């Protein structure tokens, strides 16, 4: 698969990236190199290989799910200019 200049411009448009005409050939080469690498990965035989979520074996430690307020609510609201019952008070912006 090969990326042409029109595809580079379309990808840039979809990503909302401004691309000058002078940059298109360089980006085209970059995208073609990425696609060539992905095509190379497609050729790897993975039959019998278990799916992995990490390259290092590890088990997540389970803990009880306890709801708390983080014990810093007072410090957080201390930064606000106006508060009431641990809530930030802000001016009304919509009528």
Curated annotation (Swiss-Prot):
Function of the protein: Allows the formation of correctly charged Asn-tRNA(Asn) or Gln-tRNA(Gln) through the transamidation of misacylated Asp-tRNA(Asn) or Glu-tRNA(Gln) in organisms which lack either or both of asparaginyl-tRNA or glutaminyl-tRNA synthetases. The reaction takes place in the presence of glutamine and ATP through an activated phospho-Asp-tRNA(Asn) or phospho-Glu-tRNA(Gln).
Please verify whether the record's keywords include Protein biosynthesis. Answer: yes
Identify the domain of life: Bacteria
Q: Gene encoding this polypeptide?
A: gatC
Documented EC number(s)? 6.3.5.-
Its name, as the record gives it, is Aspartyl/glutamyl-tRNA(Asn/Gln) amidotransferase subunit C
Give the organism the record lists.
Nitrobacter winogradskyi (strain ATCC 25391 / DSM 10237 / CIP 104748 / NCIMB 11846 / Nb-255)
- Catalysed reactions, semicolon-separated: L-glutamyl-tRNA(Gln) + L-glutamine + ATP + H2O = L-glutaminyl-tRNA(Gln) + L-glutamate + ADP + phosphate + H(+); L-aspartyl-tRNA(Asn) + L-glutamine + ATP + H2O = L-asparaginyl-tRNA(Asn) + L-glutamate + ADP + phosphate + 2 H(+)
Q: Which GO terms describe its molecular function?
A: asparaginyl-tRNA synthase (glutamine-hydrolyzing) activity; ATP binding; glutaminyl-tRNA synthase (glutamine-hydrolyzing) activity
């Amino acid at each position: 698969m090969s990326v042409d200049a029109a595809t580079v411009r379309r990808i840039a448009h979809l990503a909302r990236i401004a691309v000058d005409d002078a940059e298109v050939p360089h980006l085209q080469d970059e995208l073609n190199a990425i696609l060539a690498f992905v095509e190379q990965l497609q050729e790897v035989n993975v039959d019998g290989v278990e799916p992995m979520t990490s390259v290092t074996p590890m088990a997540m430690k389970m803990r009880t799910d306890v709801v708390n307020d983080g014990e810093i609510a007072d410090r957080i609201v201390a930064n606000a200019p106006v508060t009431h019952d641990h809530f930030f008070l802000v001016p009304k912006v919509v009528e």
